[in-house]
Amino acid sequence: MFLNRGKSKKNLGAIALAGMVISSMIGGGIFSLPQNMAASAGAGAIILAWLLTGIGMFFIANTFKILSLVRPDLTTGIYMYSREGFGPYVGFTIGWGYWLCQIFGNVGYAVMTMDALNYFFPPYFKGGNTIPAIIGGSILIWVFNFIVLKGIRQASFINIIGTVCKLVPLIVFIIITAFAFKLAIFKTDFWGDAVTKTQPALGSVTSQLKSTMLVTLWAFIGIEGAVVMSARAKSPSAVGKATLLGFVGCLTVYILLSILPFGSLFQYQLAGIPNPSTAGVLGMLVGRWGEILMNVGLLIAILSSWLSWTIIVAEIPYTAATNGTFPEIFAIENAQHSPKLSLYITSALMQITMLFVYFSTNAWNTMLSITGVMVLPAYLASAAFLFQFSKNKKYPNKGPVKSYIAKYTGFFAVIYSLWLIYAGGLNYLLMSVILLALGIPFYIDAGKKSKREKTFFAKKEVTKIIIIALLALLAIFLFSTEKIRL
């Protein structure tokens, strides 16, 4: 066990990193995509929603690719881009918020895993918050902890296997629905404006788009996976390749999974299928074996994503600690170059959170929504940094990407990131500010122990701390007086 000062073992290639990106994006939610998308939209609106989301996310994905090439010195980008562009406190806050977000997200995977097991062993794991479910989820938290402790490279190899295994059922689903596809059914009520005795119209295309894009917005959380692990990448180009490969691959799967079922089932039928709806669709098309296959795929998908996020979630505080922004204890590695203390602390917090799930499912669902919003400022800060850096004289114009391309990529990524934050909801954003403010004492502690204490507590950094603290107090007031509710 030793304290790392920024020399992580660089042994992850483009395939391993792409596996990280795909696995972190494709979790259990994809197996419910047909119903989620059809619930309030016709096929036409769904195609438009994916087109618009794909364009927006392309700019974010390309932001990460460009930054990995023009600033390869800034490893673990989500945190480092924010710190480099906007100072130590913004960097800390982005890292802190991202870390909390993924801690709660990983506990969400524990809940989903146990709930998925309930299909095979009812009713012991129903809802994912029974006593057997809490015990099972807790065991898995520590199993993944020890897998990652054995080494990031080994864990990444297991993750690649898991990614392939969860893609197989999805590919089978796509093939079956493609063969069952009938153009006449697909064209029926393409824009969702038909009215029947039992089925009202779905509304305007605009309203369908709005409701559907709330689903597509969250489908790409995890696209930053390769960037977060860039300190362990074999080369900067591997990070960029993995990010774009993961983006294109996932977008293709999402579109096919959402659209092809409309060629064999009508919108109202898809909207009424219980989740995971991929199992329900195959159950209707091929029978029981298809339903079982998709439920097994769901379980593998959740476990694989959970492993990816276990690797990622410990990397942020670890990297922040290596340059003094997080408390030094997070920088301790083991002999396999895994962030030992960061993993243990993260897993311990996940374990504590897991216990709370047993007592309050509704509060837990609310917390997941809040922490989902907390990842979005990381995208905004990265995009803003690219836009800012593209206009800097230090930008390598003779490098792999021209400055004007970087500038427009950053600009449109900023616009789309702001849209994501707006769509997340003001109430959740304000609650997330309260959670961000909880990190202030840890920032102060790290700053006092840093060799760059003056930088940590420069006037502009103190001003930022005061602004976050005041916003948190305002949020507490608004929630306590019920002027804003979750």
From Swiss-Prot:
**Task performed by this protein:** Catalyzes the exchange of L-arginine for agmatine. The arginine uptake by the bacterium in the macrophage may be a virulence factor against the host innate immune response.
Which family is annotated?
Belongs to the amino acid-polyamine-organocation (APC) superfamily. Basic amino acid/polyamine antiporter (APA) (TC 2.A.3.2) family.
Q: NCBIfam families, per this entry?
A: 2A0302
The keyword Cell inner membrane belongs to this UniProt entry's keyword annotation: yes
The record's Gene Ontology cellular component field reads:
plasma membrane
Q: Which residues cross the membrane?
A: 12-32, 41-61, 85-105, 129-149, 160-180, 211-231, 242-262, 296-316, 341-361, 367-387, 418-438, 461-481
> Mind telling me which PANTHER family this protein's record contains?
AMINO ACID TRANSPORTER-RELATED, ARGININE_ORNITHINE ANTIPORTER-RELATED
Species whose genome carries this gene? Chlamydia caviae (strain ATCC VR-813 / DSM 19441 / 03DC25 / GPIC) (Chlamydophila caviae)
InterPro entries according to UniProt = AA/rel_permease1, Amino_acid_antiprt, APC_superfamily
GO terms (molecular function) for this protein are: antiporter activity
**Protein's membrane topology:** Multi-pass membrane protein
Can you supply a Gene Ontology BP term from the record? amino acid transport
Q: Does the keyword Ribonucleoprotein apply?
A: no
Q: What is the protein name given in its UniProt record?
A: Arginine/agmatine antiporter
